[in-house]
């Protein structure tokens, strides 16, 4: 199977998001890369489902809480930017202060 670099990046991101989901389910707090991966995957899947950029910007702020991540992680992530594929093309989605 031949994949483009972008497709490989997406697969890596989704793999990290799956690991993060499993760790959350076990009651573990997420670290920086796991938190970014989980929120990014949420945005990409929402775009695929046809949600609007505005709704994903808002919903992306409610994927994780401070209690679900390790100390200091919320301050390390002032915003997350994801180029997601919507039904009408690719768009950049920015979520400010994603962990509240």
From Swiss-Prot:
Q: Name one GO cellular component term.
A: cytoplasm
Q: Which pathway does this polypeptide act in?
A: Nitrogen metabolism; urea degradation; CO(2) and NH(3) from urea (urease route): step 1/1
State the reactions this protein catalyses: urea + 2 H2O + H(+) = hydrogencarbonate + 2 NH4(+)
UniProt pH dependence: Optimum pH is 7.75.
Q: Which UniProt keywords apply?
A: Cytoplasm, Hydrolase
CDD domains, per this entry?
Answer: Urease_gamma
What regulates this protein's activity? The apoenzyme can be activated in vitro in the presence of nickel ions and carbon dioxide, which promotes carbamylation of 'Lys-217' of the UreC (alpha) subunit.
Which residue ranges traverse the bilayer?
A: none
Keyword Glycoprotein attached = no
A single GO BP term for this record reads: urea catabolic process
Which of the seven top EC classes does this enzyme belong to? Answer: hydrolase
Compartment(s) of residence: Cytoplasm
Source species, domain of life:
Bacteria
Q: Which InterPro entries match?
A: Urease_gamma, Urease_gamma/gamma-beta_su, Urease_gamma_sf, Urease_subunit
The Swiss-Prot or TrEMBL record annotates one GO molecular function as: urease activity
Tell me which EC number(s) this protein carries: 3.5.1.5
Q: How does it assemble?
A: Heterotrimer of UreA (gamma), UreB (beta) and UreC (alpha) subunits. Three heterotrimers associate to form the active enzyme. The apoenzyme interacts with an accessory complex composed of UreD, UreF and UreG, which is required for the assembly of the nickel containing metallocenter of UreC. The UreE protein may also play a direct role as a metallochaperone in nickel transfer to the urease apoprotein.
Q: Which family does it belong to?
A: Belongs to the urease gamma subunit family.
- What NCBIfam families does its record include? PRK13241.1, urease_gam
In Swiss-Prot or TrEMBL terms, this protein is called Urease subunit gamma
Q: What species is given as this protein's source?
A: Klebsiella aerogenes
> What gene, per UniProt, encodes this protein?
ureA
């Amino acid at each position: 199977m031949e994949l483009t670099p972008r497709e490989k990046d997406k697969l890596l991101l989704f793999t990290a998001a799956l690991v993060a989901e499993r760790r959350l389910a076990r009651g573990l707090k997420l670290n920086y890369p796991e938190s970014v991966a989980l929120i990014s995957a949420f945005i990409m899947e929402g775009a695929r489902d046809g949600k609007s950029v505005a709704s994903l910007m808002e919903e992306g702020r409610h994927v994780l809480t401070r209690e679900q991540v390790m100390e200091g992680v919320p301050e390390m992530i002032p915003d997350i930017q994801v180029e997601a594929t919507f039904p009408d093309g690719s768009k950049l989605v920015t979520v400010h202060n994603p962990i509240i």
